[in-house]
């Protein structure tokens, strides 16, 4: 369960690894929308994305024995680099399974942080299934990119920073891919202000959340069409 205590704990822990990403006021979008619009530039993190938050916090909760057995994850890019970088800081071995279609630059950057990269499957789901099997075989901890409450708690620390810098915030727009960021941010935002509105935004070509809400159950799309590859 995602709780305020855990979010506060995670917020302190991720300070060890994240760079400050102060809100940036957008005059253009403020004029276009008739609102005061700010951006939270998480692309300025060392690994290029917020994903390191969840990965770093996840590792911090593991026992020494679990860390010694290593980590396994699956990702097409950003989560891979987040786990690899966080694992390097903790001195923990990490294996990242990436689809064979992953851009070479993301593969090389993940390797650059010290992780072992295994290319398997043409899509994320195939890579993920193989990673789960590998983690079980090796007795390692599988760090899911989104379907993990600890990881989601780490991602949600973004909301804590937003509220500290802009206490009067009344709407937060959050991107949705797997849903880990949205789960963390929306949960913490509602804990801090029950009246706040959180709006999830996803690519039209990868709208699994909308499809799931419309169907009233989890829906898996046969394919996606988006440049946001994870």
Predicted features along the sequence, with ranges:
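PLP-dependent amino-acid enzyme catalytic core
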Residues: 1-230
